[in-house]
């Protein structure tokens, strides 16, 4: 049966995902940045209360995946922290200036991760040559690759995802970006073994007082009084679709 991973941005969201049938959580901060490394406090609280596998993302900033020496040092330190806290896996990825896997740096990450299952995230979708990259990731011992098939959403990239799945002895190919209940059957019919979804929505803040003339973001039009949360009903619906597909 296909595995359902839910992207979560808080302990509360991780618990919601767990309660509604998620098989695994990718734990992140900063949804508007596409997911950054969670704080130590969030990591510890999730480790204590969530019982399904949780894989934190290790990504020090938004934007591309070519990092300075200081950023890479932080990545290694965060990898060690996640390992010390007892998480079963993590999510990360580093490219060089030419859009190839930065093999020396990824080798250091794999050494720091030790026995943890490492997912190479959507840095894959920004690489120059996906098949060469997949070969490099196989050589590194990467457990899985999260990809939209190098398109803006995974449904558009499904043909590339199927091509990657057919690659012999490669890591697990996990489809992500825009995967929802309404299109999930396309991925299941294509033989995708793992799917990744945020299964969420923006929720209004409970604050009654609101200073509408102030933004805490560099985006002056950002809504400071909303937060991204996992929709438990959406998770349960996706899990049900997977189970019914398996029963066919």
From Swiss-Prot:
It is found in: Cytoplasm. The keyword Cytoplasm applies. Pfam families: CutC. InterPro entries: CutC-like (IPR005627), CutC-like_dom_sf (IPR036822). Signal peptide: none annotated. One of its GO terms (cellular component) is cytoplasm. HAMAP family: CutC (MF_00795). Homodimer. Belongs to the CutC family. This is PF03932 family protein CutC. It comes from Escherichia coli O127:H6 (strain E2348/69 / EPEC).
């Amino acid at each position: 049966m296909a595995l359902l991973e839910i992207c979560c941005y808080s302990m509360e969201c991780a618990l919601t995902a767990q309660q509604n049938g998620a098989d695994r959580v990718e734990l992140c901060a900063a949804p508007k940045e596409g997911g950054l490394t969670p704080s130590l406090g969030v990591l510890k609280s999730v480790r204590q209360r969530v019982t399904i596998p949780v894989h934190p993302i290790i990504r020090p900033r938004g934007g591309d995946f070519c990092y300075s020496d200081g950023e890479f040092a932080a990545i290694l330190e965060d990898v060690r922290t996640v390992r010390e806290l007892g998480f079963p896996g993590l999510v990360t990825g580093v490219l060089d200036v030419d859009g190839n896997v930065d093999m020396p740096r990824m080798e250091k990450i794999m050494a720091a991760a030790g026995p943890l299952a490492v997912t190479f995230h959507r840095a894959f979708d920004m690489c120059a040559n996906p098949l060469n990259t997949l070969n490099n990731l196989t050589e590194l011992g990467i457990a899985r690759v999260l990809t939209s098939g190098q398109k803006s959403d995974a449904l558009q990239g499904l043909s590339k995802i199927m091509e990657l799945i057919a690659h012999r002895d490669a890591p697990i190919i996990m489809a992500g970006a825009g995967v929802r209940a309404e299109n999930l059957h396309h991925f299941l019919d294509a033989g995708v073994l793992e799917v990744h979804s945020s299964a969420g929505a923006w929720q209004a803040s409970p604050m009654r007082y609101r200073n509408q003339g102030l933004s805490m973001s560099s985006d002056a039009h950002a809504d400071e009084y909303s937060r991204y949360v996992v929709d438990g009903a959406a998770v349960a619906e996706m899990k049900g679709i997977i189970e019914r597909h398996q029963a066919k």
